[in-house]
């Protein structure tokens, strides 16, 4: 009994003096309450003070980044990553089921029978919004596009609404699967995965792109036909020139026959007969007449 009465108070006073001289470095103090769910399991019940109380927060609002006067806020990548990891520990589907989180509305009594807690779908939606915001802020190209045109931020936050609609779907989430990959890996069969791929391809088809492709093909076909016509006309002109030269040379050499006067006359009569008659009887008859004419000319000479 003396040991407990005298030794313990002495040790307690010594511990207090040490603490006053070297106070511990406390970086974060949080008070968590616990609540029972429908199955009787006790879960942490917290309020996310970091989440903005705006109806439609921007990526800068979600991570608490104040906008500079130039409209281009400066980012601290280390602080941004730290805040994102904190969000992941709260809203990641693998962790959020074990945590009950109050909504953005103020809650005065956490022991109320119907506290304003986020549902599983709302926590999942917050996680998607956080992931997309982090992806935009970490990627310099996406950040520039968002700062200048406000494009790329397709997930507008709407608490207590239907968060499973198509308006909340997005791609390229950071640190977790995107919605497209989630659908792919959770498809029942290969047919389902292939159909989802075809649907994404159809969604990416732009009517103006199709019109441009058709116009480009038409221009290519017309250009090819025009080049073929030009080539054919040039070939015909060259062939006509060569053929005329050949006929001229043959006329000088009498087409391989003798070059005397009567041989040329005989060739002329024969070509004329060939152009006037086609049957064998007519050609034979005219050949005899032509030979008789040449014989008379030779005799008259």
Swiss-Prot record:
Principal place of residence: mitochondrion
Residue span, J domain: 58-150
Transmembrane segments: 208-228
Gene3D superfamilies, per database record: DnaJ domain
Sorted UniProt keywords: Chaperone, Membrane, Mitochondrion, Transmembrane, Transmembrane helix
Membrane topology qualifier: Single-pass membrane protein
PROSITE patterns assigned: DNAJ_1, DNAJ_2
Gene Ontology cellular component annotations, sorted alphabetically: mitochondrial inner membrane; mitochondrion
Localization terms from the record: Mitochondrion membrane
Function, as annotated: Probable chaperone.
Additional remark text: Present with 414 molecules/cell in log phase SD medium.
Family under the similarity heading: Belongs to the DnaJ family.
PANTHER family, alphabetized: CO-CHAPERONE PROTEIN DJLA (PTHR24074)
Protein name as it appears in the record: J domain-containing protein 1
């Amino acid at each position: 009994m003396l040991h407990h009465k005298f030794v313990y108070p002495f040790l307690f006073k010594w511990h207090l003096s040490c603490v006053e001289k070297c106070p511990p470095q406390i970086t974060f103090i949080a008070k968590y309450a616990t609540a029972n769910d429908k199955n009787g399991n006790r879960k942490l019940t917290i309020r996310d003070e970091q989440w903005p109380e705006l109806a439609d927060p921007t990526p800068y609002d979600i991570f608490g980044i104040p906008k500079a006067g130039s409209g281009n806020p400066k980012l601290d990548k280390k602080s941004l990553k730290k805040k994102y990891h904190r969000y992941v520990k709260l809203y990641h589907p693998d962790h959020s089921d074990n945590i009950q989180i109050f909504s953005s509305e103020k809650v005065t009594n956490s022991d109320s029978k119907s506290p304003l807690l986020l549902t599983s779908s709302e926590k999942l939606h917050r996680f998607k919004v956080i992931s997309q915001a982090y992806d935009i802020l970490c990627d310099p190209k996406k950040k520039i596009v968002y700062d200048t045109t406000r494009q790329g931020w397709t997930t507008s936050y709407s608490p207590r609404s239907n968060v499973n609609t198509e308006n909340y779907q997005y791609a390229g989430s950071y640190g977790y699967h995107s919605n497209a990959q989630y659908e792919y890996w959770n498809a029942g069969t290969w047919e389902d995965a292939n159909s989802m791929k075809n649907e994404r391809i159809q969604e990416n088809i732009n009517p103006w792109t199709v019109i441009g492709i058709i116009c480009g093909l038409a221009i290519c076909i017309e250009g090819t036909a025009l080049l073929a016509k030009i080539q054919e006309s040039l070939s015909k002109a060259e062939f006509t020139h060569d053929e005329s030269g050949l006929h001229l040379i043959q006329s000088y050499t009498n087409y391989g026959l003798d070059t005397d006067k009567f041989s040329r006359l005989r060739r002329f009569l024969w070509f004329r007969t060939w152009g006037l008659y086609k049957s064998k009887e007519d050609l034979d008859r005219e050949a005899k007449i032509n030979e008789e004419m040449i014989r008379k000319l030779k005799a008259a000479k």
